[in-house]
Structures are given as C-alpha cells and as structure tokens.
Design a protein with these regions (language model features):
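Residue-level signal for inorganic ion chemistry
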Residues: 16, 103, 124, 296, ...
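Structural helix-boundary/capping segments
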Residues: 109, 186, 236-331, 342-351, ...
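Short helix-loop capping/hinge segments that flank enzyme active sites or metal/cofactor-binding pockets
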Residues: 63-74, 144-167, 319-321, 373-427, ...
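Short glycine/serine-rich loop/turn segments
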Residues: 144-286, 327, 440-459
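An N-terminal boundary/leader segment
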Residues: 1-119, 123-125, 350-351
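Serine-dependent amide/ester hydrolase catalytic core
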Residues: 18-19, 82-90, 105, 196, ...
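N-terminal, positively charged, Ser/Thr/Ala/Gly-biased leader segments
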Residues: 83, 93-96, 100-101, 105-169
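Acyltransferase
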Residues: 93-101, 129, 335-359, 383-388, ...
Length: 521
C-alpha cells in the first residue's frame, strides 16, 4: 500500500457523503505516521487460515511529596484495599455509611484531578443505607460489601447520565445498569460515581476537552494514561478501591502503568459488554483497575460471575514457568525500562522460576494489524455520530474516526487473517510455560502534551508507542495484568505485564500475586 492520494481520500469521503474536503491535509498527515506499519501488513503473505472471530530508585522529593501517607483511622480506611474493606463490612466492624461519607469527602477534595465526571452523593448515600439495613438484618451483601467503585463513563449506571466522555451524544440518565455494573452491585459494591476518560475511549492520555484533562495524582505533569485514565487516577488517589475500565488497545494496563498500580485485562468476553458503549467489537474488553493483585482477583471474580476465591489459592503459590520473547517486546526499550525488567526477571529466576526465551513469528506485524482493525471497527461503530456531530468531537478523536473510513474491506480482511496467524504464533510461543513476562510500555510515562519521543535514536509518536506492547494482547484476546516492577531514577513508575493463554485468567492472577509477594519481601 502506498500513501493514499488526495484524489482517493476525496473520492471515498464523497462516496460516504462526508463532505469535508478542507480536512484533506489532516487526513494525509494522519496516514503518514502509521504508513510503515500498514505497509508491513500488505507486504506479508497470508497462510491458509480462517478470519479470527471475535532496579528501583528512590522517589524524587517532588514525587515523594505527592504520595498519600495515612495519618489517621479514616486515612487507613481509604488506603485499605477492597478485600480489607469488604471483610470489615461483612463482620460489621465497619459501616457502609461511614465508607460512603469518607470517600465522597475525598472525591470532593480532589476535584482538581478530574477523575470523575458525575458523582450523585444522594444516590451513593441511599445505597449505603440500604447495605447497612441488610447487614442489620443479618444478611451478607456479598464479596464486595461496601467497597467503593468508580465506573468508567462508558458503561450504563442506573441514575447516572452516560456521556462516553463526549458532548457529541445526548447524555441520557440511565434506567438500568450495564451487566458488569449490575454484578458489582449484587456483590455489595458501592458505586461512588462515573469516571472520566479519553473521549469515546479512543486515546491514550485522557486529555478530555469536554470534562477536563484527567491529572496523574502521584506524578503531576505526566499523563495518567488512557483511555481509562479517570478510573486509574481515582484508584491511585484512593478515591475508590476499584476502578472499572475498558481496554481496546491497552486502556486498562497502560493507565495502570502510568499511575503505578494494577490493571487486569481478562480473556476476551470473560466479562460481559452488554450496556457498554462500543469502540471496536473484536478488541473491547472490560476489567478492573486496583492497587493490588488480590483486589484485582476478587473484582474479576464478581465481574465475570465466578465463585468467590476461585482465582487465588489459599495456599502458597509455587514458582511459575516463565517465557520471555527475544524480540519485539524487548526491542525499542527505554534504558530505565530495560533495567527494571532485567532486575525483575533476575528476582524471579533467583526465586526458582525457570525463564526460557522464544521467538514469535510475525509479531512485528502487530502494530499494523491493530491500526487497521481499530480504525475500521472504531469508525464503523461511531459513523453516525461522526457524520451528524463530528464538529462536536475533540480534534484528535474526530481525525481518528475520519481516517477509518479509508480502509477497504480487503484491507480489514487481510489484517484479520494475519491477526489469526500472529495469535497462533503467540499461543505456540508459550510451550510448557505458565505465563509470558513483557514490559507494559516501552517508555516511561510521558509528560502531558507530549506528541513525539526519542527512543533508540528515533523520533516516535507517543500513541502507538505507549500501546505497542499492550495492543497485540488485545487482538489475541489473551488475559494480561499490568503491575509495578520498579521506578525510574526520577521516581516514575515502571510496570510489567503478566500474560497468559486465552482462558488462563486464574493462572495470570496467581503468577502476578507470586510476583507481587516477591517484590514485597
């Protein structure tokens, strides 16, 4: 594929009755920076295959000053994880009403973070009193009893307007919960509000032009990640114990990496997407953002409708068998990210985990496959919105949606065929290993407003760079967890990913818990 000509772009947009020829220069520029990845896809042969269906430095003084240190019983409560809060509520040593009051107060005191779009304090208190009455009657509300949860404003929440982070749709108050939210409520969770996001969940920095740019609570001036930046910021700032996120190319794991916390993307379709505003049907996943692996496990159990305590064993976890890819995931790395990954793998090996190295044929095609798939599906899902209200969209999201119209059916189909081949290569690369360990991002969290970075002597665009190691896991549909493994010399967080085979969510969570316990020693 060569760079699309102005004539081609003009003809396609006219055919689709999207008459905005004045935007041709923007469309051409947008194609230019992804062209090399796209060309790799078109120059690759397709085998006969079906289309896929569906070391840590001390914090600097400035960052250390931003850390939240508990100094009272109330502070200890908001710092507690979901498991601890639920335990205290279930044994009636802690009132849901007290929890609601404390977290609502913290959310109000941290409005400058723009972590939430809507908080209905009356509804939160009403739900808390209902939980309290159930406890007084001797009922067990469930495994998330009284746990404060922030839900990405991409999902229907009863009594809240659904905005999808945009002004291009009418924000209607929802009469019922999305399936995942209903499960959280049924497990006793307190929904404390809907969280901010990158508009339409289509971006990596959560710089929302309509509801305010989400701020990184611990690393001021750096992005919180996206698109689930509000959920990550809320959890990192202890405004919620669990954040619900969506992930199309890395939107759970990448914000977790930018905020130095935990983000779990389950196997594709393990968590229902009913009632969730779509971006890309074959890439969208729903999962939890938390401050610990244990909290991620209990949240996932509820979100996926699984039995309590089914993800993490009550006994000691043995050293796992680990595989490390030789190329791609360990190429084009920031030096400090490489050092942190080397140190983490050395710790795992010293603790008894055998680590093998493998090649993954075709993995270099991943960026192009993701670009074509996401652009095509994202534009299809939002075409009516773009055609009718494109002028109400933020410029970055509008441009992404506009350029998706120029991919042809043959482009999309070939990308899916190659996607299936890469998926099979990824599965084969595990061999007899339990998990694959890779970096969450090739670079440190960038400063807000950064468009390009220098990496290995090359100038690279921020968006595809930050999702380079997460998006292949999305289009393969594998479970993966992002968790802290170190910090840079300046104190910025560095996360690794624990990746498993499709359906091996429990294995990923158990290995991640083993890694977490090892880091705490």
């Amino acid at each position: 594929m060569t760079r699309p000509t102005a004539e081609f772009l003009r003809a396609v947009s006219a055919f689709r009755r999207y008459a905005h020829a004045e935007r041709l220069p923007d469309w051409e520029q947008r194609f230019a920076f992804g062209l090399a990845d796209i060309e790799q896809v078109f120059e690759s042969a397709v085998a006969a295959a079906p289309v896929l269906c569906a070391p840590a430095a001390n914090l600097t003084e400035s960052f250390a000053a931003g850390r939240y240190v508990p100094s009272s019983i109330a502070d200890e409560l908001v710092s507690a994880g979901a498991v601890q809060i639920a335990h205290q509520v279930r044994n009636r040593s802690l009132s849901p009403v007290r929890i609601a009051e404390l977290f609502l107060g913290r959310i109000e005191a941290h409005r400058h973070l723009n972590a939430f779009i809507t908080v209905n304090a009356s509804l939160v208190m009403e739900d808390a009193h209902v939980l309290d009455h159930r406890l007084r009657r001797g009922e067990d509300p469930g495994p998330l009893a009284g746990v404060p949860v922030g839900v990405k404003d991409l999902m229907s929440v009863r009594g809240y307007p659904l905005t999808a982070g945009t002004k291009a749709i009418e924000a209607k108050v929802q009469e019922r919960d999305a399936a995942v939210v209903a499960r959280l409520r049924a497990a006793g969770a307190l929904i404390v509000g809907t969280t901010n996001l990158h508009e339409l969940a289509f971006g990596i920095n959560s710089a929302n032009p309509h509801f305010g740019h989400v701020q990184n609570p611990h690393y001021p001036g750096y992005i919180p990640g996206g698109s689930s930046g509000g959920s990550a910021a809320a959890v990192a700032a202890e405004l919620a114990a669990i954040g619900v996120g969506s992930c199309t190319g890395g939107s759970i794991r990448q914000p977790a990496a930018c905020c130095g916390i935990v983000g779990f993307k389950p196997t594709y379709d393990a968590v229902p997407r009913e009632g969730v505003f779509p971006l890309a049907w074959s890439l969208d996943h729903i999962g939890p953002i938390t401050r610990s692996v244990e909290d991620a496990a209990i949240a996932f159990e509820v979100m996926a409708g699984l039995p309590e305590h089914s993800m993490l064993p009550q006994t000691a976890i043995t050293a796992p068998r680990i595989v490390k890819p030789r190329k791609f995931f360990y190429e084009m790395l920031d030096d400090e990210v490489r050092m942190a990954m080397d140190a983490a793998l050395a710790r795992f090996r010293a603790a008894g985990a055998p680590i093998g190295e493998v090649d993954i044929p075709g993995i270099e095609l991943a960026p192009g496959i993701q670009l074509i798939t996401l652009a095509s599906e994202g534009t299809q899902a939002n075409w009516d919105l773009l055609a009718r209200h494109g002028d109400k969209l933020g410029e970055d999201v509008r441009l992404r949606l506009e350029t998706g119209q120029f991919y042809l059916a043959i482009d999309y189909i070939k990308a899916q065929q190659l996607r299936n081949q890469v998926r099979q290569s990824m599965i084969a690369s595990f061999g007899d290993a339990d998990v694959m360990i890779i970096p969450a991002m090739p670079v440190l969290p960038p400063r807000s407003g950064t468009m390009t970075l220098d990496l290995g002597g090359k100038t690279v665009h921020v968006a595809p760079t930050l999702t380079r190691f997460t998006s292949p896991i999305n289009f393969c549909g594998f479970p993966a967890l992002s968790m802290p493994c170190g910090r840079s010399r300046s104190g910025l967080p560095i996360n690794l990913q624990v990746v498993g085979r499709p359906g091996a969510d429990a294995t990923v969570l158990r290995v991640a818990r083993w890694c977490e316990q090892l880091a705490a020693v």
